[in-house]
Swiss-Prot record:
Coiled-coil ranges from the UniProt annotation: none
Signal peptide span: none
One cellular component term from this protein's GO annotations in UniProt: cytosolic large ribosomal subunit
Pfam families, sorted: Ribosomal_L30 (PF00327)
Database matches in PANTHER family: LARGE RIBOSOMAL SUBUNIT PROTEIN UL30M, MITOCHONDRIAL RIBOSOMAL PROTEIN L30
Organism: Sphingopyxis alaskensis (strain DSM 13593 / LMG 18877 / RB2256) (Sphingomonas alaskensis)
Assembly with partners or alone: Part of the 50S ribosomal subunit.
GO function terms (MF aspect): structural constituent of ribosome
HAMAP family reported for this sequence: Ribosomal_uL30_B
Aminoacyl-tRNA synthetase in keyword set: no
Keyword flag Secreted: no
Protein's name in the database: Large ribosomal subunit protein uL30
Encoding gene (name): rpmD
CDD domains from the UniProt entry: Ribosomal_L30
Amino acid sequence: MADKKIKIRQIGSPIRRPKDQRKILTGLGLGKMHREVELVDTPEVRGMIRKLPHMVEVID
């Protein structure tokens, strides 16, 4: 059984953001503008995305 995936794209710059927001971006595997990453859809990943609605968008 395959795990459900979620695809996200970074739309906000980490420059002049609080350190905790930059760490969350790094934890999601992002760091540069317009990069996309595909992650396993878990409650932990969803929570990280919910903390950064102004910096990431869900594609899939």
